[in-house]
């Protein structure tokens, strides 16, 4: 049976941790907190939160090792290992893309990744 996008998002949300916008801003007080905006570049350019890095959902898995806080940019595996236990928050427009992306990063082995519930619309 085929699944709708809404079903995929609901399934992802059952496996991940979501946080409120207030919890995100509290977490951002820690300079080691990573905020990744998974919206498309034109959405990011229109409005973005300070310190957010734009890795659209379609390329997140291939680019996360390039995050500025990764200390091993030349070695993908070492960069991923460096980032895997860092607090990572994902945000999008409404919370759907960030939920799916959070689920994917958890499957990659990231341990402290969370999705911002409701995204920018919250």
What are these regions (language model features)?
Residues 1-50:
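Flexible, polar/low-complexity N-terminal or interdomain linker segments that lie immediately upstream
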Residues 53-60:
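Thiol-based oxidoreductase modules, predominantly thioredoxin-like and allied folds used
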Residues 45, 61, 121:
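Nucleotide phosphate-binding site architecture
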Residues 62-68:
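Short, charged, surface-exposed secondary-structure boundary motifs
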Residues 46-49, 66, 102-104:
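Short amphipathic alpha-helical segments
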Residues 70-122:
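Catalytic cysteine-centered active loop of the rhodanese-like fold, especially the PTP/DSP P-loop
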Residues 34, 53, 114:
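Conserved beta-strand positions in the Rossmann-like core of class I SAM-dependent methyltransferases
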